[in-house]
């Protein structure tokens, strides 16, 4: 075995070892001191050491103003440690997300039970149930069937390139409303690139390719990644940022009413719709020149799409039941808490049932309802759930733990003093400023990390200004989702960039006007529609 001999002890040999002994005859090559040092001092190991080293520097050298701020200083050191590992990816992101479970108790920030509670609450339940439903949709190819049907509707004759682009983008945005935007981008990108595979490229053919063909390809890929981001803004389940915001609101203001799914939808959907319209217009102006439909029509025809749809066959019982469960979930989410005058079904349970309750309950049905494909088989089994994105679940838990630690340690109050200049500015100037700050930071860090860092500070600023905290929390969280300029901004951007159809200059050219438009719409809608939607949330 591996070039060695295996000696097995006889049953009557009491001096022989109980386990087999492997004799490896391969010579052991001793490393020199230089080789050993090169093995130890690799860039990744240096990045690993950077986290605790920076933490030690903060804890030993930083003075936040008195002995009573010791816990806040420790919290700052732990934050620096975690963000160093997140930025350098020295340690896998899910593992870094679990470090609060041991760092917070060891540094005297929070008790172990309190930290662990952050990793499993109603918001996490909402995410888990949604992810299981999304896996069911993906398993039965419902997303592909939906995309092909909608694209068929918009693929008119003669071909209208802007209209076809609208169909692809609208489908992606709709899918992203009901599942995580990264999952939506991952699921929709193969559908989009499948359509683009019919188009010729200058590298694969000797024929002269019309410039509109390449431009339309860029428009489709950009449309998918940006539509996934924009669509995710409209619902709580569309992106982790919205869930982090809800969790922080619940943590900082436990006596206030929680942000419900329907409440966020009434604000998030109009905002997302406005940004989506701008996205489509920008893509049409930049990438759909006159004559694009005529150039694309030889390669894109309804018959091609119908052929792919025919390959999927008619909808079977399992697909219909998954859609029924998904539809029931959306209805229950929207009707749990409607208005003060129309209480919704949540009143029956005295407010004890949350959106996570519904999410897990409907996901459980998938393991009970038969699929009618094989005898005894259910719509879902646990083997199909092995692709659950636990990294996102752990990241959300870390965000909630950090938010709670920043609050209880007093770090938020200390850091907010550095932004005291904002307290004297009018709200109409603060909202876009906060949004732009978040939108800038999120290009270089994950949107979840940006939200986790900024929102606690914005809460303290809002308290000092005497305004409703959500008037600053929402612009900070939404701004963190405007990662439109760089491939590294979000995983969705990476998905699009790796297709080879777009370059960084395409993202900057398209993303910059989108970022500006999003900031303007948010600055207008938050003090108007947002004030109306969130007005009933007292206890602040």
Curated annotation (Swiss-Prot):
Transmembrane segments: 46-66, 75-95, 123-143, 164-184, 219-239, 265-285, 311-331, 353-373, 392-412, 419-439, 466-486, 520-540
The keyword Disulfide bond appears for this protein: no
Membrane topology, as annotated: Multi-pass membrane protein
Listed GO CC annotations: vacuolar membrane; vacuole
Residues making up the signal peptide according to the UniProt record: none
Any single biological process term in GO: malate transport
NADP is among the record's keywords: no
Free-text tissue specificity from the UniProt record: Expressed in leaves, stems and flowers.
Compartment list: Vacuole membrane
InterPro entries the record matches: SLC13A/DASS
Similarity comment: Belongs to the SLC13A/DASS transporter (TC 2.A.47) family.
Protein task: Putative carrier protein indirectly involved in the uptake of malate and fumarate to the vacuole, probably by regulating the energization across the tonoplast. Uptake of malate to vacuoles is inhibited by citrate and by the uncoupler carbonyl-cyanide m-chlorophenylhydrazone, but seems to be not affected by sodium. Critical for pH homeostasis.
Protein name as it appears in the record: Tonoplast dicarboxylate transporter
UniProt organism field: Arabidopsis thaliana (Mouse-ear cress)
């Amino acid at each position: 075995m591996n070039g060695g001999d295996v000696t097995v002890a006889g049953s009557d040999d009491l001096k022989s070892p109980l386990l087999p002994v492997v004799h490896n005859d391969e010579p052991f090559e001793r490393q020199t001191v230089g080789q050993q040092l090169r093995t130890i001092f690799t860039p990744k190991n240096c990045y690993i050491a950077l986290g605790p080293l920076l933490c030690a520097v903060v804890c030993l050298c930083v003075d936040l103003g008195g002995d009573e701020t010791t816990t806040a200083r420790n919290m700052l050191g732990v934050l620096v440690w975690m963000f160093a590992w997140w930025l350098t990816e020295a340690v896998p992101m899910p593992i870094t997300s679990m470090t609060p479970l041991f760092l917070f108790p060891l540094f005297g920030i929070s008790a172990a039970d309190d930290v662990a509670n952050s990793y499993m609450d109603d918001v996490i339940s909402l995410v888990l149930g949604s992810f299981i439903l999304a896996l069911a949709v993906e398993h039965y190819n419902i997303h592909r069937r939906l995309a092909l049907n909608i694209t068929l509707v918009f693929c008119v004759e003669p071909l209208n390139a802007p209209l076809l682009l609208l169909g692809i983008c609208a489908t992606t945005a709709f899918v992203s409303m009901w599942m995580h935007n990264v999952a939506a981008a991952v699921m929709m990108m193969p559908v989009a690139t499948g359509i683009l595979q019919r188009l010729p490229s200058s590298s694969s053919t000797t024929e002269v390719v019309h410039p509109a063909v390449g431009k339309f390809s860029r428009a489709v890929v950009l449309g998918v990644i940006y539509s996934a981001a924009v669509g995710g803004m409209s619902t709580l389940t569309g992106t982790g940022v919205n869930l982090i915001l809800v969790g922080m609101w619940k943590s900082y203001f436990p006596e206030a009413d929680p942000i419900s799914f329907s409440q966020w939808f009434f604000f998030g959907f109009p905002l997302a719709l406005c940004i989506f319209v701008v996205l489509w217009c920008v893509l049409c102006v930049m990438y759909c020149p006159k004559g694009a439909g005529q150039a694309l029509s030889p390669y894109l025809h309804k018959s091609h799409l119908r052929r792919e749809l025919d390959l999927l066959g008619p909808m079977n019982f399992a697909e219909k039941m998954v859609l029924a469960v998904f539809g029931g979930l959306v209805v229950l989410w929207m009707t749990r808490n409607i208005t003060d005058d129309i209480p919704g079904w949540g009143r029956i349970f005295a407010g004890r049932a949350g959106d996570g309750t519904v999410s897990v309950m409907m996901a459980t049905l998938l393991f009970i309802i038969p699929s009618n494909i094989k005898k005894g088989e259910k719509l879902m089994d646990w083997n199909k759930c092995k692709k659950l994105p636990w990294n996102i679940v752990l990241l959300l838990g870390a965000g909630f733990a950090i938010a709670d630690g920043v609050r209880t340690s007093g770090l938020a109050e200390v850091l907010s003093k550095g932004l005291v200049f904002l307290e004297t500015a009018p709200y109409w100037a603060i909202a876009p400023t906060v949004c732009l700050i978040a939108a800038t930071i999120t290009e270089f860090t994950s949107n979840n990390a940006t939200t986790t860092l900024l929102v606690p500070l914005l809460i303290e600023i809002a308290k000092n200004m005497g305004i409703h905290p959500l008037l600053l929390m929402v612009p900070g969280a939404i701004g963190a989702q405007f990662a439109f300029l760089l491939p590294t901004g979000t995983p969705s951007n990476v998905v699009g960039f790796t297709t080879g159809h777009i370059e960084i200059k395409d993202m900057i050219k398209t993303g910059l006007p989108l970022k500006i438009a999003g900031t303007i719409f948010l600055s207008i809608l938050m003090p108007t529609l947002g004030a109306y939607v969130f007005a009933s949330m007292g206890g602040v």
